[in-house]
């Protein structure tokens, strides 16, 4: 049987290679099946570590914990990551969203367990510890409790405070990531056994530090999604109740006097077959209404004739005007016009006789 360390390493490797980075869709049966089996393995491993083997105790410090056991403090962190990816395959959308809400809340609980465990061992970053202390109900935190809020509702500095805290977390996370990378390189190039154990212990502690900062981001994302799903489910229930009430009203018989509490249909015809008026109406010029909408918002087709369009273009000065005068049609019965054309032809003949072809510009060739 594999040791606890081997089981833990196998689960983390499986998460990194096939669950965190995968070509499968998260809602596919293959992915969810692998995810569920991994969660079960990690839960069994957690029971073995904390209950059966009792590797951790509330009356000890981190110095009392062996180097090989330090990484097991991140079990709840990985549980939170895995559970947040769970999805239901129910065909009903509301039921599917309801199950997702449950999974997200379970994920937040696992993240809180992880932070609480680090706090017990005095390993929690002060920024993270401050946020953990702001939760009124630690295992049921609200999105508004993650960041400092102004005392006065009229104070508009809430966004500025949130931005400031986010920048602090980001810079702190970046600093820890750099130290973690340096430790990994140093451990890889170190060959001495004594220094190797110290570097490995420091690496495990720095990794837990990095996980605690990342946990805040995961909690924020989960709470934001929980808020969206809660609003979605509330609206769905309200719509179902409204539609049920409407159906019950429609199923009741109409009043004998003809009274009804149903809303009138806008598309109801004006008159029935007998000529009786069914609803109030106002005589309007429909063509004029459509014409006014042509240049407004929305996609309306043209509702004017070509002549109207050209008149409008002329009014707005979009039509180019001017140019040469059009030639008048020749009037062969006009004697003056015939004389002018005759003289013009004679002049052209005389010009051609006095100017031989090719006698123009000879380009200095003689």
UniProtKB/Swiss-Prot annotation:
Phosphorylated by TOR kinases. Dephosphorylated by CDC55, TPD3 and SIT4. One of its GO terms (molecular function) is protein phosphatase 2A binding. GO terms for cellular component: cytosol; protein phosphatase type 2A complex. It holds the Pfam family TAP42. Involved in negative regulation of the TOR signaling pathway in response to type of available nitrogen source. Inhibitor of PP2A phosphatase SIT4, which results in inhibition of nuclear export of MSN2, due to lack of dephosphorylation by SIT4. Also required for rapamycin induced activation of expression of many nitrogen discrimination pathway (NDP) genes. In complex with PPH21, required for organization of the actin cytoskeletom during the cell cycle via a Rho GTPase-dependent mechanism. Gene3D superfamilies: TAP42-like family. Residues 318-366 are annotated as: Disordered. This is Type 2A phosphatase-associated protein 42. Residues 337-356 have a biased composition (Basic and acidic residues).
